[in-house]
């Protein structure tokens, strides 16, 4: 049986567990700072270090963030929930248990729409992914392995407890994902959502967003799930996709070879582009959950929920729909513009200043995006203000300048800002749109090129394009290109 034949006979069942580190100023159960760049073991206190006799106190901002994200994913907010102790021993967990939520999470039964883009056609397919639950918990510390970037090969390990007690939201998806592309897109959509809400920076490199993948394969048409394998250690969206694609191939090959799939945790190795076995996967019974005795149950009133709901911004899916339906943008442009909330706000400011939405979309998604990418900048630091972009588009629309001149002055606007009107006046770049003035210039150009005129008369080559180029050269690109083309066609026909 060929590998291709085997692969088409199976489907992958994929779910993601995503840990989102919140950007609160203090930790979830104490007043210690959450500053990422602090020296090791400086943002600690008896509470987050698990000293005897101390009591945790819930940071209300964590609850607010959980409810807001729950509302954003159309989840059911629990009027009553509680915290639980998750028991396990590891050097980065000083209490030997983690305060989390087990059977009564703050949010259940949500969903998130993802968009899958065809790279060739740019067509978009939408799919809704169910979200089983969202719950609050505290982060563990960070192990630093001396002598190696991994445990294997290191001489000893150091523990930084600064991260202990930093608030996390864990979002557990339904097993609705089928490919690595879908999983990576889901993770990106989740990051986009927490950034729009302002509750996390979603930075995977710093560990603000961490994804664990649960994956199994089964024959197409079979209802029962296969044996689930967990994959960890993916620090980018491309790593999520590659790890899943590798694991699908590995499991299908193992089944085809008559091997057993074990329920285990595997690590993604970026260097070798493969997953390796780490440990046998634990079940919930292994953690011996029981209710946290030092924290009272949580109650969220309808009034509290409505207060937090009123603070939600326009979410990405709503923005995309508005851009398509009211502004007439393509689904692809709407997607690109809403990927980053600051880009969307920039676009909207330019449109509100009077510019045509499609023209603004073209400039933002093409020339401006290229400049930002090449210079590793964000749009919030761009010298070209939205109002100036609207002014530039207006100058083109009115025929004051050509699109070519607009692109010629764009680098200065991007780097230094300023008024497009003042720049073209200072440089003498106002477009020549007077028919009489252009006619005189064209007649002079034709008179200066008798050989080319003869070629035109004999029907050789695209000589009209030659004369347009000569007019543009003589006017320094200031001639109205559309009017120039029309007048040249008319004058050449008469010559």
Curated annotation (Swiss-Prot):
The keyword Ligase applies. Its EC number is 6.3.5.-. Signal peptide: none annotated. Keywords: ATP-binding, Ligase, Nucleotide-binding, Protein biosynthesis. One of its GO terms (biological process) is glutaminyl-tRNAGln biosynthesis via transamidation. Belongs to the GatB/GatE family. GatB subfamily. HAMAP family: GatB. Heterotrimer of A, B and C subunits. NCBIfam families: gatB, PRK05477.1-2, PRK05477.1-4. Allows the formation of correctly charged Asn-tRNA(Asn) or Gln-tRNA(Gln) through the transamidation of misacylated Asp-tRNA(Asn) or Glu-tRNA(Gln) in organisms which lack either or both of asparaginyl-tRNA or glutaminyl-tRNA synthetases. The reaction takes place in the presence of glutamine and ATP through an activated phospho-Asp-tRNA(Asn) or phospho-Glu-tRNA(Gln). This is Aspartyl/glutamyl-tRNA(Asn/Gln) amidotransferase subunit B. It comes from Synechocystis sp. (strain ATCC 27184 / PCC 6803 / Kazusa). The lineage of its organism: Bacteria, Bacillati, Cyanobacteriota, Cyanophyceae, Synechococcales. The gene is gatB.
